[in-house]
Amino acid sequence: MAKSYYTFLNINENHIDKSMKKIGNVISCEKVNLFKKQNNLSYKESFIYNNLTYLLWYNLKEKKIFKNFEKLSDVGYLSYGDPYIDINDKKVTLDKINSLLDYENINNFTDFSDKKTILEIGAGSGRTTEAILTFNDELKYTICDIPPALFISYKRLSNVFKEKSIGLLYNLNEQELNSQINNYDISFIMPHQLNFIKNKKFDLSIAIDCIHEMRKRDIAKLFNNISTISNYFYFSVWKE
């Protein structure tokens, strides 16, 4: 599961050069099991994963968002036997690090403090969603995705946020969706249902590294929909 959604095992030079330059000649005094063999990964994959995680950990430590690392729950971030390394007795994953980096980038784009409603396109495993809701408990959150990701993130968030009301609304028609979408803390819908949303304006919409997987005509439809139903739109693209 982890290899499909959020574990990066193929590294190119341009993926790590800036991160290594930022660290420079740091001498580590941390307690870390850097040569751990990960379950479901080969020794080569484990070596790459462990070192990349440690590299990004050092970069994360220089950022303000680092102080929130321990707020992230292992219930979600280690829910599928995800690979991790122990650093100073903390379970550290690429998933946690990337979620914090994404959170900081979004918050720098437009502050979460004045947001009440969020729409996320292509939430995948739900890693970014979990971070955002962990730090902003009062948000109303809608996830728009396709199976199997839709159900993977649903299961994850249901396990992490047991006190929140969560609705699977993917099979509702236009009238039903508009009458029910405001009844839940977290709602799950399908892409075609974006056309159904009429009397709702999201404070912020986000799309993390998923737009490049869409067809050009679908990208045009997405941007048209977002311009109608959202005040802000943050997106990032992993590759051109």
Each model region followed by its residue ranges:
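Conserved Class I S-adenosyl-L-methionine-dependent methyltransferase catalytic core
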Residues: 1-113
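Hydrophobic beta-strand segment of the Class I
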Residues: 205-206
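Conserved SAM-binding loop of SAM-dependent methyltransferases across substrates and taxa
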Residues: 125-136
